[in-house]
Regions:
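C-terminal cap/substrate-recognition subdomain and adjoining C-terminal extension
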Residues: 106-132, 136-300
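Alpha-helical substrate-recognition element adjacent to the catalytic core
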Residues: 5-163, 256, 262
Length: 300
């Protein structure tokens, strides 16, 4: 039945019914951390740290020292250190420079093919798939990776640039609690980091663009716990991702599952037929089935 006709005959309930009628298929959001989840290391370790003449362990220790010494944000501390060390090394930090470093970022097995594979599976089931990044890494570096175009929105740290195009100040700093705000933005279909007005407006659950039960969150560590917990608590699914070659990461994933922070854990292998592939496809099947049952229950 056409949405306008339903609008006419349904009286006080016309708004919600019309919206549901327009939703011929559910939208499923795959929301992923980046470092340790899609990539085997921190993105700064694939070119930038080497360019400033340091070793990864040395860089991160100096960043931690700033945070501890100043009782400051770990995120802002690493962003400041990038500024300071780049200046010492005579490296300009323009958006295109960050993107260039991003081209060297390594990805886990199957990641490059993952998006097309899952998109096609969703399409075959009558489900629209959307991919999002929710990371404490740098948006500009992620934009330089070969998978950047796969994401509807990259929520991550970023810089403010001067008239010469050089980074001069942190624009967005995303720590483990700040990550949670982006779940609610995705929930309401808000893509702007700056927009707080729409994010704080009350909105009925049945008109939100992507309900939490239609979210799948991927993360590798304890900094993802708030997001994992929120998605799981509101009916979505959280997957603890681990590098199968890293015993520490395996133990972290097992701990997350044991503490009921996640629904599933899986090695960071995104190839066809992998455990990750099986879990995600099965979740998509369930979301589609629940969507159809809800429509039947509302007699549409």
């Amino acid at each position: 039945m056409h949405a306008r006709i339903i609008h006419y005959i349904c009286g006080e309930n016309h708004i919600n019914v019309a919206i549901l009628a327009r939703r011929s298929k559910p939208i499923v959001a795959l929301i992923s951390d980046f470092d340790g989840t899609l990539s085997p290391g921190n993105m700064q370790e694939f070119g930038f740290i080497q360019a400033i003449g340091k070793k990864p362990q040395e860089f991160w220790q100096e960043s931690d020292d700033i945070a501890v010494g100043q009782d400051a944000s770990n995120i802002l501390s690493y962003m400041k250190l990038m500024f300071d060390e780049a200046r010492k090394a005579g490296i300009k930090l323009r958006r295109e420079d960050f993107k260039r470093f991003g081209t060297s970022v390594e990805l886990f097995d199957g990641v490059k093919e993952w998006f097309k594979m899952i998109n096609e599976y969703g399409k075959s089931k009558g489900v629209k798939i959307e991919h999002y990044i929710n990371s404490s890494g740098l948006a500009e570096m992620i934009e330089g990776t070969e998978i950047a175009s796969e994401f509807k929105r990259i929520f991550a740290c970023s810089f403010i640039y001067n008239k010469e195009g050089e980074a001069e100040w942190p624009g967005v700093a995303v720590d483990y609690t700040a990550k949670t705000q982006f779940l609610f933005k995705i929930n309401k279909g808000i893509l702007s980091v700056r927009d707080n007005k729409k994010g704080n407006e009350s909105q009925a659950e049945d008109i939100k663009r992507i309900p939490f039960p239609h979210m799948i969150y991927f993360g590798d560590g304890e900094t993802d716990v708030p997001c994992m917990k929120i998605v799981k608590m509101f009916g979505g699914n959280s997957i603890g991702v681990y590098n199968p070659e890293n015993k520490k990461k395996i133990n972290v994933a097992k701990k997350l599952l044991r503490q009921h922070r996640v629904n599933f854990i899986a090695p960071a292998c995104y190839t066809y037929g992998s455990r990750m592939h099986q879990i995600v496809c099965t979740i998509i099947d369930k979301i589609k089935a629940d969507f159809e049952l809800t429509k039947l229950a509302k007699h549409i």
